[in-house]
Every structure is written in C-alpha cells, then in structure tokens.
Amino acid sequence: MGSRPRSPSAFPAPWWGQQPGGPGPAKRLRLEEPAGPEPRVAPSLEDPAGTPAVGALTSIVVLAAGCALRVPLDDVDLVLELPPTSILRVSLDGHTLILIPEVLLSSVDERSGAQDDSSAGLEVDVFLGALREDVVVEQEVFCASVPEIAAQEEAYEEDADPEFPELQMDSAAGSAAGLYSSARSMFSPYREGPIPEPCALAPNPSSEGHSPGPFFDPEFRLLEPVPSSPLQPLPPSPRVGSPGPHAHPPLPKRPPCKARRRLFQE
C-alpha cells in the first residue's frame, strides 16, 4: 500500500530526525540520570577503622580497670566496656570516641603490642607522649629552680649580715654630727686662724650604745694648696683699723672751708 503524504506544517521535521525504532534524546537523558540518592552506610560498632566524617568531633577517654563508659542516646543508654589490652573506637552521629585502658598508659610495651586499631593507637601514643614530656619538663624546671633560689637567698643573707651593724651605727650617729665634727680644723681664706668649732648637737637617745664615729678623717684639710697646681690661695685680707705694710701715712687735718664755717659757726 502506498503512504499518504502528510500535510505541510510550520516546522516540518527533518527526514534524518527520529528513527522509528530508536529512543528520543529526552528518553536517553532520563535513562542516564541516577534513579535516586544512594543510601548512606550507617556507622556501626563492627567497623571501628572506618574513616570519620568531615568535621566530626573526636574524644579520647581513658578508662580505669573495671570501669565502663555510659553514653546516653535518644532511646537507650550505650554502655561501653573494653578489655585491658585493646583500644576501642566507636563512631556515633558526628562524634568519635576512642577508649584506652589505663593499663596501656603505664607500660610502653603493652601499648606497642595492641593490634586492634593501629592508626588510633599511634595517634593516641603520639599525643599522650608529647603531653607527658611537657609535664615532666615542667616538674623538673620547678624542682630545680627552688633550691637555686634558696641558695641565692642564703648567700645574700650571709653577705649582708656583717654590713647591718655598720649601717645601724652610722645612722644612729647622725649625718649632721659627723659632718660638723669633721670641720673642726677647716681654714678660711678670708680670716686668719681656723674657724671655731661649732657646738655639738644633742646626742640621740637611741645611739647611747654605739660610738658616734665621724664619716671623714679629722686630719683632712680643705682649701690647702696642691704642690703641683699653678693655682695658689689669695693672701688674707687686712683687718679694718690695723695698718698694713703698704698703708699710707695719715693726712694732716685741714681747717674747714669758708662755706662750712658760715653754716656751722662755732
């Protein structure tokens, strides 16, 4: 039988388009799309070495001998117990628990013999080993610093003990009395003879048992010329009323002037 020609349309389909037995592009796209999201594998206790999720929180718990860890969940309470020679790793929703017996921490040989979870055991050993080294170093530094400080303080006290009586004696004598007593033989360039010694101050009642020794040597002379110095002291100034070697002879008394005689008539 002959085929009837189709009526022309606004958008005629090309003759090389869809084949009668082949699928269309839309159906092919539907077949290539995944049927649905793949179900995620729920974490379980049977797979302790599984890779933890990104951003999961990891906690390390050290259990003493004969103790267990109780983890409260939504409906039940999970009780975790482990043998004293193994390390248990539990993965929950976004939280990873690593349980370590206390016996393994006390012996390096027992920690190295644990084969249940080698990766977790290495991480825990490195972490706890570094922490233990820090604690030991702090204790050694603290214990060593205490005797050194005590020995230094004792040495300071022994060195300072002989100096304390001298300081007390000097302070009891009084700085003013010591300075005044050292000026008993001081000479002045403007007067002849030494300066008279000033009166001594009243003794301090607290210094009766100490000897008020002067601070300076009483034989010390101030303002004495130095032999090697070109500067020499000035000669003493002449006293008023005493004729010097270069004194001028007294002038004769003159009669008062005429104006003075008129003003002051005798």
Swiss-Prot record:
InterPro entries: PRR23. Residues 1-18 have a biased composition (Low complexity). It comes from the Eukaryota. Residues 227-238 have a biased composition (Pro residues). Residues 1-47, 197-266 are annotated as: Disordered. Residues 255-266 have a biased composition (Basic residues). It holds the Pfam family DUF2476. Belongs to the PRR23 family. This is Proline-rich protein 23A.
